[in-house]
From Swiss-Prot:
Pfam families assigned to the protein according to its UniProt record, in alphabetical order: EF-G_D2 (PF22042), GTP_EFTU (PF00009), RF3_C (PF16658)
Protein name as it appears in the record: Peptide chain release factor 3
Molecular function as annotated in GO: GTP binding; GTPase activity; guanosine tetraphosphate binding; translation release factor activity, codon nonspecific; translation release factor activity, codon specific
Protein's cellular compartments: Cytoplasm
Binding site for GTP: 18-25, 86-90, 140-143
NCBIfam families (UniProt xref): prfC, PRK00741.1, small_GTP
Biological role: Increases the formation of ribosomal termination complexes and stimulates activities of RF-1 and RF-2. It binds guanine nucleotides and has strong preference for UGA stop codons. It may interact directly with the ribosome. The stimulation of RF-1 and RF-2 is significantly reduced by GTP and GDP, but not by GMP.
Family: Belongs to the TRAFAC class translation factor GTPase superfamily. Classic translation factor GTPase family. PrfC subfamily.
Originating species: Stenotrophomonas maltophilia (strain R551-3)
PANTHER family listed in its UniProt record: PEPTIDE CHAIN RELEASE FACTOR RF3
Repeat keyword on record: no
Limits of the tr-type G domain: 9-278
Coiled coil regions in record: none
Length: 534
């Protein structure tokens, strides 16, 4: 086996998806704790607590207690290298989350035991479906009262349309929680609450027949457990590796992230069964991870990870070959060579210069406005990875400046925020308005906060009569020019210089489409096909 193939086979790159408040950031912390990446997990709950959660590093996130930006963390575990991409927990952050899911090989779905499958989980699951992403499920907050576990499995199967294969099973819940049984090994892990900031190895009995277990959990509970296990093993699906890797079955674990309980069986199972990096499609061919030449694509751009340095970092997922510090690469969209000098590896906000990286790893490249989301880097081959979209925003606001002299800073700030993909920025052809588009309201708060915090610009966002946006394309130049002349009042350029139709109403959009049958109106745009500005 080549060195590239060997290193690729050790990688496990995944994201955690959940509805807000299901405990995703806490679970992220605990996985890092068990992986030895952090000594002490920061609790997410206390907003004013001295120790903030490791993965929530932007000041706004620290104030609000939600993950606004997706960060990347790497840790070694049991001979494997785990790359965990944290996704925003708040309901608004659809696009960024979608793009993160294009950069992973599997996902972990977190469900609150009391709430079951929630709306955001359904949406994220649809995204995973598009790519048949393998998913494991962690049913969290077992230390609180919640739904019956059998009912929960039924709900996941019915609502999300995926077969469940329980791997651990709870012994009680809430006040009566005593532990979990590992259905594949037969081991019983006892619940010992309280030591939630340090790594906790629970007491393990080899089976439910082990002497001393009845004294620990009570004879009646043990009898109930035997009956329940008979029922579960008779009614549920056994774990099937092929079905899981095809995205048709989800192995299910129960636990309490905040109490470090049930996390270790999940992590052990994950590194053993989750897929290593997979082959990926480009415009020219399919690229296998074990190929010797480096390829990778940018799925996210983050500005000002270090406020002292006003920097922008492009996050690149390596798809094949070996990255080494300072190597020369080919930036496919611009057709230019680019030296990747001080590339970074991540442990949330702690950044280290990457000496080398392998398929499945994510590196950060310093970016001065030349790199866009969706860009592909190779060692010379002109291919582009596909499937990294921009979505048409659903909400629009006009930016208003408190100080008109700061227009230049405002334009620069909006262009950079748009380059990250958190919000989109449109400049109408016939006015000087600056219009921002987003998938959710919170993104406008984030934009206003970051403009003030990072660019020194105080801006407000007011309502604007735009209901939806569509990118417009036409292969016939003459017809496109006619369309531009007739519809100039509704046309704008996005931050990458593409023509966009801003419709005041859905009816207006429908009429425009009917009147111009030769023009294609798209709700998404492949991020790779951008023309960078600034």
């Amino acid at each position: 086996m080549s060195e590239v193939a060997n290193e690729a086979s050790r990688r496990r790159t995944f994201a955690i998806i959940s509805h807000p408040d299901a405990g995703k950031t806490t679970l992220t912390e605990k996985l890092l704790l068990f992986g030895g990446a952090i000594q002490m997990a920061g609790s997410v709950k206390g907003r004013k607590a001295a120790r903030h959660a490791t993965s929530d590093w932007m000041a706004l996130e620290k104030e609000r207690g939600i993950s606004v930006t997706s960060s990347v963390m790497q840790f070694p575990y049991e001979g494997k290298i785990v790359n965990l991409l944290d996704t925003p927990g708040h309901a608004d952050f659809g696009e960024d989350t979608y793009r993160v899911l294009t950069a992973v090989d599997s996902a972990l779905m977190v469900i609150d035991v009391a709430k079951g499958v929630e709306e955001r989980t359904i949406k994220l699951m649809e995204v995973c479906r598009l790519r048949d992403t393998p998913i494991m499920t962690f049913i969290n907050k077992l230390d609180r009262e919640g739904k019956d576990p059998i009912e929960l499995l039924d709900e996941v199967e019915t609502v999300l349309g995926i077969q469940c294969a329980p791997v651990t099973w709870p012994i009680g819940m809430g006040q009566r929680l005593k532990g979990v049984v590992h259905l594949l090994t037969g081991e019983v892990h006892l619940y010992e609450p309280g030591r939630n900031f340090t790594r906790q190895d629970s007491t393990i009995f080899p089976s439910i027949d082990a002497p001393g277990l009845a004294e620990k959990i009570g004879a009646q509970m043990l009898a109930e457990l035997r009956d329940e296990l008979d029922l579960v093993q008779g009614a549920s699906h056994p774990f099937d590796l092929d079905a899981y890797r095809a995205g048709k079955q989800t192995p299910v674990f129960f636990g309490s992230g905040v109490n470090n309980f049930g996390v270790q069986p999940l992590l052990d199972f994950f590194v053993e069964h989750a897929p290593p990096p997979q082959a990926r499609t480009t415009t020219g061919r399919v690229i296998a991870p074990e190929e010797n030449k480096l390829t990778g694509f940018v799925f996210k751009i983050q500005a000002n990870m270090d406020p002292q340095h006003r920097d922008r970092v492009a996050f690149m997922r390596i798809c094949s070959g070996r990255f080494s510090a300072g190597m020369k690469t080919f930036h496919v969209r611009t057709g230019k060579d680019m030296k990747l000098a001080n590339a970074l590896t991540f442990m949330a906000s702690d950044r280290e210069i990457a000496a080398e990286a392998w398929p499945g790893d994510v590196i950060g490249i310093h970016n001065h406005g030349t790199i866009s989301i969706g860009d592909t880097f190779t060692e010379g081959e002109a291919v582009t990875f596909t499937g990294i979209p921009n979505f048409a925003p659903e909400l629009f606001r006009r930016a208003r400046l408190r100080d008109p002299l700061k227009l230049k800073q405002l334009q620069k700030g909006l262009a950079q925020l748009s380059e990250e993909g958190a919000t989109q920025f449109f400049r109408p052809l016939t006015s000087n308005d600056l219009i921002l588009g987003a998938v959710g309201v919170l993104q406008f708060d984030v934009a206003a906060y970051r403009l003030k915090d990072e660019y020194g610009v105080e801006a407000t966002f007011e309502q604007v009569s735009v209901s939806t946006a569509r990118w417009v394309h036409c292969s016939n130049e003459k017809k496109l020019e006619e369309f531009r002349e007739k519809n100039a009042l509704n046309l704008a350029l996005d931050a990458a210089g593409h023509l966009v139709y801003l419709a005041p109403t859905r009816v207006n959009l429908q009429l425009a489409q009917e009147r111009s049958p030769d023009v294609r109106f798209s709700a998404t745009r492949e991020a790779a096909h951008t023309v960078s500005v600034g």
